Amino acid sequence: LRNSSAASDVYKRQNNERAAIIGGGDGGVARECISKNFNFIDWYELDPEVVDVCNKHLGDIGKKATEKNSVKCVWGDAFESIKSVSDDTYDHIFVDLNDDQFCIDLAAKNMDSLVRILKPKGVITAQVGSQDKKPQQVENWLNVFNQNFGNAKLSRVYIPSFDCSWNFSSSIN
């Protein structure tokens, strides 16, 4: 999400009070939420060991976001965990899962829960892969967003470490 002008536009349009991160084991999204002054960040991550390994070997990405007071880590299955979250809790939800069809299907299956916990006028953003390398995958993500929100916007940013452009889809609830 860093360096994405579309993500920057999203931040300008909304309240940055509460964010939820689904996945994102490397901590990059959490770091960016901290830098954008979200007051409360709930980070739903399956495995604390993944975060520990990323902190150890990729420390610059997450900048030890788990140690920040504004970040609350919720370990375990994110989609099970969010079942207990109150309606209309989050201003922004970031979906940072693996970029494969399994994860697209997983997000689609749980989209009702994500919509439920997203505030009215809240924004959901997902990293959807590279349109250059896997255009069908990006299209599948856009279909999920459009079926649930009808207003998916695609942004693109060059990621040097990926050596390609990467896409993000955002929708407003």
Description of each model-found segment:
Residues 5-142, 164:
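The AdoMet/dcAdoMet-binding core of the Class I SAM-like
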Residues 130-173:
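Class I S-adenosyl-L-methionine
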